[in-house]
A protein has these predicted regions:
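Single conserved hydrophobic/aromatic residue that forms the stacking wall/gate
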Residues: 1-6, 10-11
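Alpha-helical bundle segments that constitute or directly flank the non-heme di-iron/ferroxidase center
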Residues: 14-15, 30-59, 75, 79, ...
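Helix-loop segments that flank and shape redox-cofactor active sites
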Residues: 20-33, 49-68, 119
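Short, charged/polar, low-complexity loop and linker segments
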Residues: 21-27, 114-116, 184-192
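Active-site-proximal alpha-helical scaffolds that flank and shape metal-associated catalytic sites
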Residues: 66-172, 203, 207
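Acidic interhelical loop/turn segments
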Residues: 148-154, 183-196
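Short loop-to-alpha-helix "cap/lid" segments that border enzyme active sites
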Residues: 170-185
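Acidic, carboxylate-rich catalytic segments that either coordinate divalent cations
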Residues: 192, 196-218
Length: 218
């Protein structure tokens, strides 16, 4: 984990960060149609996820929080989503095809859960729901950095999340989370009632991440 809060609320669930989908991708045994289905759904996911991060700007209490949230929105829209577009284009799947695809139920369940927290909760609620995706993919990048699948798009995917650029995104988000919790709850945030609530949110989002992988394997 990258942070103080992260060490308390860390991604330890191997059902997520070492899911069979990622294992198969890393050793070149994942069927390409499953990966393309995942990319399509993840593209739709990132559209909603970007909106949720935009809500983090609204929920922020200071300029530093706003800057990190805004930077994350930029990374999602202008870099991560572009990766999906470029990988899919190699297989004849256009940007229009991606945008007009139907969302799977697991995708809807996850993104709407996060957005609802963004609308109804405070920044800590929202960040706790967003953290498993950002930090989990960072952990996946570290775990599989040295794997070397022959399939180009699998290679490219692993390189993206293991890259210094993405790891820096994780560090910035972790720093945002740390400071946001300490600002609002104090140094002893683990002992607060709020901590119990946000842990439940974090764990729920982690389970929804696992469901997303399971959907991709169908």
């Amino acid at each position: 984990c990258w942070s103080l809060v992260g060490s308390e609320m860390c991604i330890r669930d191997s059902l997520y960060t070492k899911h069979d989908f990622v294992n198969k991708l890393s050793n070149d045994t994942l069927k390409e149609e499953k990966f393309l289905h995942y990319l399509t759904q993840d593209y739709l996911f990132l559209i909603q996820f970007s909106k949720a991060w935009a809500l983090a700007i609204l929920k922020s209490d200071n300029l530093e929080e706003m800057k990190i949230a805004a930077s994350t929105v930029n990374d999602l829209i202008n870099f991560e989503m572009e990766l999906h577009i470029s990988l899919c284009a190699n297989y004849g799947i256009s940007k229009s095809d991606l945008e007009n695809a139907d969302e799977e139920n697991q995708n809807i369940a996850y993104t709407r859960y996060v957005l609802e927290l963004g609308y109804s909760g405070d920044l800590l609620d929202l960040l706790s729901s967003l953290a498993p995706c950002v930090l989990g993919y960072g952990e996946i990048g570290i775990n599989y950095k040295n794997s070397n699948p022959k399939t180009h798009m699998y290679q490219k995917w692993i390189q993206t999340y293991s890259s210094n650029e993405y790891q820096d995104v994780c560090k910035n988000v972790a720093n945002l989370i740390d400071k946001a919790f300490i600002l609002r709850l104090g140094d002893d945030f683990v002992g607060t009632y709020k901590w119990q609530k946000v842990n439940k949110i974090f764990n729920k989002s982690t389970l929804l991440e696992i469901d997303f992988w399971n959907m991709a394997m169908k």
